[in-house]
Amino acid sequence: MENLALTTLLLPFIGALVVSFSPQRRAAEWGVLFAALTTLCMLSLISAFYQADKVAVTLTLVNVGDVALFGLVIDRVSTLILFVVVFLGLLVTIYSTGYLTDKNREHPHNGTNRYYAFLLVFIGAMAGLVLSSTLLGQLLFFEITGGCSWALISYYQSDKAQRSALKALLITHIGSLGLYLAAATLFLQTGTFALSAMSELHGDARYLVYGGILFAAWGKSAQLPMQAWLPDAMEAPTPISAYLHAASMVKVGVYIFARAIIDGGNIPHVIGGVGMVMALVTILYGFLMYLPQQDMKRLLAWSTITQLGWMFFGLSLSIFGSRLALEGSIAYIVNHAFAKSLFFLVAGALSYSCGTRLLPRLRGVLHTLPLPGVGFCVAALAITGVPPFNGFFSKFPLFAAGFALSVEYWILLPAMILLMIESVASFAWFIRWFGRVVPGKPSEAVADAAPLPGSMRLVLIVLIVMSLISSVIAATWLQ
């Protein structure tokens, strides 16, 4: 398993080098090839882990004396999230080969070596972060994802794109200071950077380590007060918005917080309390910011901020003893990644074909572009938690856990009621836009829509299927 894990981690970086020095006309082909090879290695790793009865393995790769600097953790959670980030990386790379062409009506632009190279580096960095068994390893890949996000958000090189990229880099880097604090404190208290050593922390050191990780998580996952970068990051090409801002980069914060909870053991309840309060505030504020949005990608960005808030709320609940909340939150990472990626790529399909992503200009999509129309419907129902789509099987465990804990912690009851109201209101708002955009007589922009390339259609079909079955995959794997 060690060799498979290392190969999965290193292949995207090797691919980025190959893409960088290849002729531009071959960049997309090399990008897809290395993303596919990485996916095959990832699936082989998961198969080997399954055949070993899913017994967790921790491997130290770099150490100085007894100090673990870098290592790998292969367990049910890391392999599940690895599947998400690598498989979606492949889908986004395939989608990009159709989207980044001169036939794109919104952005007629052929994909370059730079695009595919940074996308591959990002896939590798996400694999490295998910598999890291030390805080130092997490920190390294945390920073690499930040650098890649700057390069990819600014890809079109407009003034607005460059400002948005710099804003994302600065805010997420401010968040990373929390991870530096956590790593330094962990080392000073335990003599190692291993995540497993967090269970040995006592006294004030616990607050510094877990508080630092939570602060870093807020920055990377666009939670209040560091949410401002994500809506502006929609200047990126839409496949990048789908991968970075729905499936991978924004999940980094949630994942490192979840990993700390899994490995930490005795976490101060004040960390859980602060996490819940800030998550609740983010969810409610994010919903209010839905209301004025007419740009489909900005609407989805604010939706992502609220959905990430749900994940932080569930993880914070788990600190008070709810195993159901922990597993529900991890499943939420998986299910939201597929459903929201679908939604973003539907937005990309509409902008490619119609030349706009402004919702008031889109009508009658189902008549002219049936596949994006179906995708819009499935994604809207999935992210708002309607059965039988995957989002329902993420939200329901969090509601069950929250109401169960409210018997012991009465303050949770009004919080859960507020979350129920937000959930229903969010459903109503997306159904409102669905009714305006998908059925009816096609608007001028939609009536004149160009056909979608086969690569884009293929990815939309796969994501529609995954929006139905990913919850089954997550629940089965975590058992």
Swiss-Prot record:
Disulfide pattern: none
EC category: oxidoreductase
This protein's name: Hydrogenase-4 component D
Keyword line: Cell inner membrane, Cell membrane, Membrane, Oxidoreductase, Transmembrane, Transmembrane helix
A GO CC term attached to the entry: membrane
Family: Belongs to the complex I subunit 5 family.
Segments traversing the membrane: 3-23, 30-50, 55-75, 80-100, 117-137, 168-188, 208-228, 238-258, 270-290, 300-320, 330-350, 369-389, 390-410, 411-431, 458-478
GO biological process, alphabetically ordered: anaerobic electron transport chain; anaerobic respiration; ATP synthesis coupled electron transport; electron transport coupled proton transport; formate oxidation; glucose catabolic process
Organism field: Escherichia coli (strain K12)
Taxonomic classification: Bacteria, Pseudomonadati, Pseudomonadota, Gammaproteobacteria, Enterobacterales
Function field: Possible component of hydrogenase 4.
Domain of life: Bacteria
Pfam (any one): Proton_antipo_N
